[in-house]
């Protein structure tokens, strides 16, 4: 059991299993960050494509006319710019979360376990593939290193 303090306030005791759960709870969302960022970038690209098509050329008339600047285009552009700014802010938040996780993993004393955590949670490899990255250790040994690293990670989260 470990006493947990947050901001000088006593929060109670956590056992090893709870500390490991806290570490996994923190790291699990990190696995999806690259996918989330890619989808946000795709969303921004689609918004840009939609924006450029607002002033499209009208071929349905006898005389071809350009889209010009229809009334309300300024509002659409403004909304687009606001949405892009929001999405860019979300990308920054996700990037910061990933960088924080990397920094915390790098600070672990359990280096073999840290390698496993990096491959599994930061680089989004399967657990089995992450175990292989530490070299000639059995799966059982690799699991122990991972659990030691998760326990250390959990302790550092609650300190």
Question: For each predicted feature, which ranges?
Answer:
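N-terminal positioning helix adjacent to the helix-turn-helix/winged-helix DNA-binding module
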Residues: 97, 111-113, 145
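N-terminal interaction/assembly modules
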Residues: 1-107, 159
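DNA-recognition helix of helix-turn-helix
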Residues: 135-156
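Short, conserved sequence motifs enriched in acidic/basic residues, glycine, and aromatics
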Residues: 107-108, 136
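Topology signature of small-to-medium multi-pass alpha-helical membrane proteins
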Residues: 88, 123-129, 146
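Helix-turn-helix DNA-binding module
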Residues: 124-140
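Short amphipathic alpha helix immediately N-terminal
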Residues: 108-125
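Hydrophobic, well-ordered secondary-structure scaffolds
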Residues: 93, 117-118, 146
């Amino acid at each position: 059991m470990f006493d947990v303090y947050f901001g000088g306030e006593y929060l109670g005791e956590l056992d090893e299993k709870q500390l490991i759960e806290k570490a996994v709870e923190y790291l699990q969302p990190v696995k999806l960050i690259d996918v989330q960022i890619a989808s946000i970038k795709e969303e921004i690209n689609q918004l840009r494509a939609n924006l450029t098509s607002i002033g499209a050329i009208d071929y349905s008339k006898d005389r071809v006319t350009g889209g010009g600047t229809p009334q309300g285009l300024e509002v659409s552009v403004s909304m687009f710019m606001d949405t892009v700014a929001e999405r860019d802010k979300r990308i920054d938040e996700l990037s910061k979360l990933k960088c924080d996780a990397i920094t915390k993993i790098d600070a672990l004393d359990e280096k073999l376990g840290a390698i496993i955590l990096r491959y599994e949670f930061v680089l989004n490899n399967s657990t089995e593939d992450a175990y292989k990255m530490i070299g000639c250790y059995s799966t059982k040994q690799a699991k122990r290193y991972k659990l030691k690293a998760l326990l250390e990670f959990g302790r550092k989260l609650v300190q």
